[in-house]
Amino acid sequence: MALNKEDILTWLEGAKTMEVVDLVTAIEEKFGVTAAVAAGVGGAVSVGSADSEEQTEFDVILMSFGDSKINVIKEVRAITGLGLGEAKALVEAAPKAIKEGLSKSDAEELKKKLEAVGAKVEVK
C-alpha cells in the first residue's frame, strides 16, 4: 500500500515528539539534507524578498550539555514534557532543536533556563 501526503500528516498528528525527531533524523541521514536548510529555502521561495523581512520565529538549539548532563536532561524534560529516556536521547544527540517556531522573547527565556543548568544553547 502506497502512502500519500494525507496518511503521513495523519500519522504526524498522532506521533510523539521523539518519533518525529527520529523521523526527521532518518530523513536527514537518508537524503543528506538538514531540516534547517529545507525550512530556510522554503521560506525564501515563498517570500519574495526574505532578506528585507525580520525573523519572527526562532528555534532553540541545544549545542551541548556541558558538565551538567543530568540537570540539562531534567530541564529538557520540564520544557518539552518528554519522558526520561526521550529527553536523555535528545540531549545526547546534541546539537538538536529543543523547541522550534518560538517568538524571540520565548526563545531567549528558554535559552536562559537551559544555560542556567549548564547547557550551551543557540537561538536561530
Curated annotation (Swiss-Prot):
Species source reads Borreliella burgdorferi (strain ATCC 35210 / DSM 4680 / CIP 102532 / B31) (Borrelia burgdorferi)
- Note the superkingdom of the native organism: Bacteria
Q: Which Gene3D superfamilies match?
A: 3.30.1390.10, Single helix bin (1.20.5.710)
The record's section on Pfam families has:
Ribosomal_L12, Ribosomal_L12_N
Q: Name one GO cellular component term.
A: cytosolic large ribosomal subunit
Keyword Nuclease in record: no
Q: Does the keyword Oxidoreductase apply?
A: no
What family does the database annotate?
Belongs to the bacterial ribosomal protein bL12 family.
Question: What UniProt keywords apply to this chain's record, in alphabetical order?
Answer: Ribonucleoprotein, Ribosomal protein
Q: Name one GO molecular function term.
A: mRNA binding
Q: What does this protein do?
A: Forms part of the ribosomal stalk which helps the ribosome interact with GTP-bound translation factors. Is thus essential for accurate translation.
Write down what this protein is called. Large ribosomal subunit protein bL12
Indicate the quaternary assembly. Homodimer. Part of the ribosomal stalk of the 50S ribosomal subunit. Forms a multimeric L10(L12)X complex, where L10 forms an elongated spine to which 2 to 4 L12 dimers bind in a sequential fashion. Binds GTP-bound translation factors.
Q: Which PANTHER family match?
A: 39S RIBOSOMAL PROTEIN L12, LARGE RIBOSOMAL SUBUNIT PROTEIN BL12M
